[in-house]
Amino acid sequence: MYGSEVFRKLIDSFPKLRVVTGILMSKLYLEGDELSVTARKLPGEGYYDNYNAAMQLDSSEKISLHRKSKLVLGVEKLPFIQYLPWMKNLAINLGGSSGGYGTQKVPSVFFNSQEEKGIAPIICYESIYGEYMNQYALQGASLYAIITNDGWWANTPGYHQHLAYARLRAVEARRDLVRSANTGISAIINKKGEIISHTEWWEQAVLKGNVQHNDELTFYVRYGDYLGRIAAFIAPLLLLLTLVRKLNKTQQRLNLKK
């Protein structure tokens, strides 16, 4: 893409331009490299991994990469594949490679030499995980950018729900969010979760708008789902207390009858 005349003209006109897009990529393992559980054998010798990834292109001609960390079960990820390799044949192929992508443990944040503000490259299904997305903000992301393909939902409530998750993530982190949906609803969302502009479903269009960076960390970003954890701890205690009280009342009634 750096060799594209159109891209070069854009860079010359807008030196701070940052293009974030999706890419399917592969990694070839060299002899002696430690293999991941998703590594595939080449027809001859050697192994490789496939990744669902995002990349950033800018004026520095340096490519920044983020490999999707939260994979869709049954499409991009199969459980216990290292023990049940035959399950690869059961994977649902929705375009591209299927049956076990590679991942990276910690999400990447895109920076560049022209601007210190970080962009969080969020790929599709990753946007439903609130605590996972907090890691982007903790690493300096001041703007969220989601790239997704919602076509496999077809015209069902699924792609609406996926968009709703994006609004929730914007509120949790108080980050403006841009969403590019290849076959869904693209949108610009502010830090209050309000949709500033959007396309229709499966509409080919371009959105133009202003977004603001925010470096502040919200309570949720700092501490995560603490309410859920507290509730999970208290719930069995409340259940036990209820059972004890019920048993005590039953015992009291029996004592009165005597």
Please give the residue ranges for each predicted region.
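Enzyme catalytic cores with a strong preference for nitrogen-chemistry domains
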Residues: 1-258
